Amino acid sequence: MILTGKEIQKRIGKDIIITPYSEKQLNPNSYNLRLHEELLIYTELPLDMKKPNLTKKQIIPESGLLLKPGILYLGRTLEFTETHHLVPMLEGRSSIGRLGMLVHVTAGFGDVGFKGFWTLEISVIQPLIVYPGVEVCQIFYHTLEGQITEYTSGKYQANQGIQPSMLYQDFEK
């Protein structure tokens, strides 16, 4: 089952931590998260799964930044989230999708116990000017049945910013 907005609000500070939190971003069954001003762009193509891939930092100015099709932009949420006893999931807002912007490729599913900023895998299907602080996605929460084992040791746990792919670490095992 998915938590209602009222239930999300009731669990803030307990099972759900969102920092900063604003009641204005609460929806009937989700909470809107905003785009941070920093993006990362991979600088060498093709990308290689077996090694770290280089990136460059791009800041989105207040006046906006033109995103172009065919480029993967890694962004992050402005909000830090932490979730216990629930499964957090992320989805793009419909208003963003209607402009041709995708906020994740496949990583909209979080683990129980995840804490950190959400890295967004941003792409656009037509040129689009984006702005820092815009509400680009929404987080919602599923309840669980059965014994819970929280996510604690993953590559992306307790991150402090945008996380490029660390898939190469899987090859080192």
From Swiss-Prot:
Pathway involvement of the protein, from the record: Pyrimidine metabolism; dUMP biosynthesis; dUMP from dCTP: step 1/1
Active site residues per record: 121 (proton donor/acceptor)
Catalytic activity: dCTP + 2 H2O = dUMP + NH4(+) + diphosphate
Protein EC: 3.5.4.30
Alphabetic keyword roster: Hydrolase, Nucleotide metabolism, Nucleotide-binding
InterPro entries membership: dCTP_deaminase, dUTPase-like_sf, dUTPase_trimeric
Residues of the site described as Important for bifunctional activity: 108-109
Residues that hold dCTP according to the record: 93-98, 111, 119-121, 138
BP GO terms, sorted: dUMP biosynthetic process; dUTP biosynthetic process; nucleobase-containing small molecule interconversion
Family annotation (SUPFAM superfamilies): dUTPase-like
GO MF terms, alphabetically ordered: dCTP deaminase (dUMP-forming) activity; dCTP deaminase activity; nucleotide binding
SUBUNIT field: Homotrimer.
Family to which the UniProt record says this protein belongs: Belongs to the dCTP deaminase family.
Protein's job: Bifunctional enzyme that catalyzes both the deamination of dCTP to dUTP and the hydrolysis of dUTP to dUMP without releasing the toxic dUTP intermediate.
Protein name: dCTP deaminase, dUMP-forming
Species of the source: Leptospira borgpetersenii serovar Hardjo-bovis (strain JB197)
